[in-house]
């Protein structure tokens, strides 16, 4: 973790009158919360897909054996929707969320045109961004796990819903 990040955390704690008891990297903290100790003996990858980055932690033999990050995440998908549908970023994010539970969505583009779009049509348009996200995560998992696929991959985080 970069020194400036640690110093910022310590400064915030000090201003709040608190002391640091421990500092854990986010992917390791996620594993500790989401994967029971009995499952950590298995070779499992936990991928936390956030807005800007996807954090990856891998377990085997009861412990975290590797962790890493790729700079591709949910915002890439939102940007692709924005580009293809001519939506500003907040409306593209809203459309992305609506696609999770609806087969069609109604959007108004930046020119004021209202269009009803089918989920499959949108997914086809943004498939290059989806492929980049999945390929980046897959490549990093293999790199972290000595070029072998883990027994399971668990997806968490807001970006995992897309």
Model-derived segments and their meaning:
Residues 1, 22, 48, 69, ...:
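Small/polar loops that bind or transfer phosphate-bearing groups
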Residues 13, 48, 81, 137, ...:
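Residue-level signature of catalytic and energy-coupling elements of molecular machines
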Residues 37-67, 81:
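Gly/Thr-rich phosphate-binding beta-strand-loop-beta motif of the actin/hexokinase/Hsp70
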Residues 129-138:
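A general structural motif
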Residues 151-160:
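Glycine-rich beta-strand-to-loop/alpha-helix junction loops that act as flexible
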């Amino acid at each position: 973790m970069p020194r400036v990040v640690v110093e910022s955390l310590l400064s915030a704690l000090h201003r709040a009158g608190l002391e640091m008891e421990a500092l854990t990297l986010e992917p390791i903290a996620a594993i500790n919360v989401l994967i029971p100790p009995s499952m950590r003996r298995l070779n499992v990858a936990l991928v936390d897909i956030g807005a800007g980055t996807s954090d990856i932690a891998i377990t085997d033999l009861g412990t975290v054996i590797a962790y890493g990050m790729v700079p591709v995440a949910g915002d890439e998908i939102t940007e692709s929707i924005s580009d293809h549908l001519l939506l500003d970023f907040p409306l593209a994010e809203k459309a992305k969320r609506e696609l999770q539970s609806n087969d069609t969505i109604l959007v108004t583009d930046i020119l004021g045109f209202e269009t009803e779009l089918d989920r499959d049509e949108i997914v086809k348009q943004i498939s290059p961004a989806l492929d980049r996200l999945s390929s980046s995560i897959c490549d990093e998992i293999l790199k972290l796990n000595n070029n072998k696929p883990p027994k399971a991959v668990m997806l968490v985080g807001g970006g995992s819903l897309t």
